[in-house]
Every structure is written in structure tokens, then in C-alpha cells.
């Protein structure tokens, strides 16, 4: 399943709407080639439509990029709800579940890093609508980890959350620059060691 297929919503009749098809194609192209490298003409052509239709649904490329990232952020945020359902009332298990999920993601063969982090590098302009999506997501993710660390009664929850956050971001860069061999196992071991170091 491609990134595009993972982020498609269908209409009432079960068919993919033009808007969703455009968004799905954009998601796939942006992730594989980078946001700056992909123009709206390429997206429209790959989606089997034209620029006029694209701009009818997305007033600008910036708005299309923002919606692409918003969908990714929503999907990532929903994973926290699944962890809470799998480990109700057990914040430490939820934290470890998140760590294991991230390790599996980093170790997967199609991992090109975090799409939101990649976008942040490509879009440094603070007033870009996509930048606000990225910052809101990363801030919320960090706060979620802080809350879990605090609920698990671990010492210095903010510091631990930052350590885990930086470990994950570093692992993503390592996966792209050096390779993935053994990376998932090392990520889990290091994360577990960080958690253990903050136990009361």
C-alpha cells in the first residue's frame, strides 16, 4: 500500500472524489520526491485531472501542502488513541508501545523519515500555512509524551520526553544516512534505558 492509498477518503458511493485523488497523489509525490521538487502540474497530471480542478479544491499549492500534512498529523495522533485503548490506565505501557511503534516505523524498508520533519526542513518560512500544522503537531506530540511520563510517575517527565523525542529524530536521520540494520533494536534498548534512568 502506498502512502497515497493510506490517506484516501471516499465519497458516499465509495468512489474516490477528485479532491481526494489529488490529495492522495500529492501525498505520494511529496513524500517520495520532496515538496519543493513537485509542482502542481505534475500532481494534476498524475491525478488524471488539470490545474483548474486542482485549484478549485485547493486555492494554492501551500494550502494543498498544509492539507497533506494535516492528514498525516491526524493519522499519527490517532495512534495515541489506539495505544490508550490497548493499554487503558497504564501510561508506562502506552509509552513503551509508542517506543515500539516508532522503532518498527524507523526500521521499515520504506522509511524516508518523518514526513512532517522533512517538510519542516523544506518549509522554513514561519508564515507558511503548513509550518503551523507541523509546529502544532510536534508540540502536541511532545506534550503527549510528557503527560505519559508524568502519569507513569517517572522523574523529570519533561526532560525524559525531550530525550525520547531527540532519540527518535536522531534514529530517523540515521536510517536515511547510515542504514537501518539493527536500528530498531537499538532504538528500543536506548529508549528503555532512558525510561529506566528516570524511574523513582
Q: What do these predicted ranges mean?
A:
Residues 1-17, 199-200:
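N-terminal intrinsically disordered/low-complexity leader segments
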Residues 105, 147, 165-183, 194-200:
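Amphipathic C-terminal alpha-helical segment
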Residues 2-4, 21, 25-63, 67:
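Helix-turn-helix
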Residues 67, 81-112, 151, 157, ...:
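Hydrophobic alpha-helical connector segments
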Residues 76-77, 83, 93-97, 126-151, ...:
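Amphipathic alpha-helical packing segments from all-alpha helical-bundle domains
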Residues 93-94, 106-132:
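Amphipathic alpha-helical segments used for helix-helix packing
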Residues 70-76:
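Short, basic, alpha-helical segments at the C-terminal edge of helix-turn-helix-like DNA-binding modules
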Amino acid at each position: 500500500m502506498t502512502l497515497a492509498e493510506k490517506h484516501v477518503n471516499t465519497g458516499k458511493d465509495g468512489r474516490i472524489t477528485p479532491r481526494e485523488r489529488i490529495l492522495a497523489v500529492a501525498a505520494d509525490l511529496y513524500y517520495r520526491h520532496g515538496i519543493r521538487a513537485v509542482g502542481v502540474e505534475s500532481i494534476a497530471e498524475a491525478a488524471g485531472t488539470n490545474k483548474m480542478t486542482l485549484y478549485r479544491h485547493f486555492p494554492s499549492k501551500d494550502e494543498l501542502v498544509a492539507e497533506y500534512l494535516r492528514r498525516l498529523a491526524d493519522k499519527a495522533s490517532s495512534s495515541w488513541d489506539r495505544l490508550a485503548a490497548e493499554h487503558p490506565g497504564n501510561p508506562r505501557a502506552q509509552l513503551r508501545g509508542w517506543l515500539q511503534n516508532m522503532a518498527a516505523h524507523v526500521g521499515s524498508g520504506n522509511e524516508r523519515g518523518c514526513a512532517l520533519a522533512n517538510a519542516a526542513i523544506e518549509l522554513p518560512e514561519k508564515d507558511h500555512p503548513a509550518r503551523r500544522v507541523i509546529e502544532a503537531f510536534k508540540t502536541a506530540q511532545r506534550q503527549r509524551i510528557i503527560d505519559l511520563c508524568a502519569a507513569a510517575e517517572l522523574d523529570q517527565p519533561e526532560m525524559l520526553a525531550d530525550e525520547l523525542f531527540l532519540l527518535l529524530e536522531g534514529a530517523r536521520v540515521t536510517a536515511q544516512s547510515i542504514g537501518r540494520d539493527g536500528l530498531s533494536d537499538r532504538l528500543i534498548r536506548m529508549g528503555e534505558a532512558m525510561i529506566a534512568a528516570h524511574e523513582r
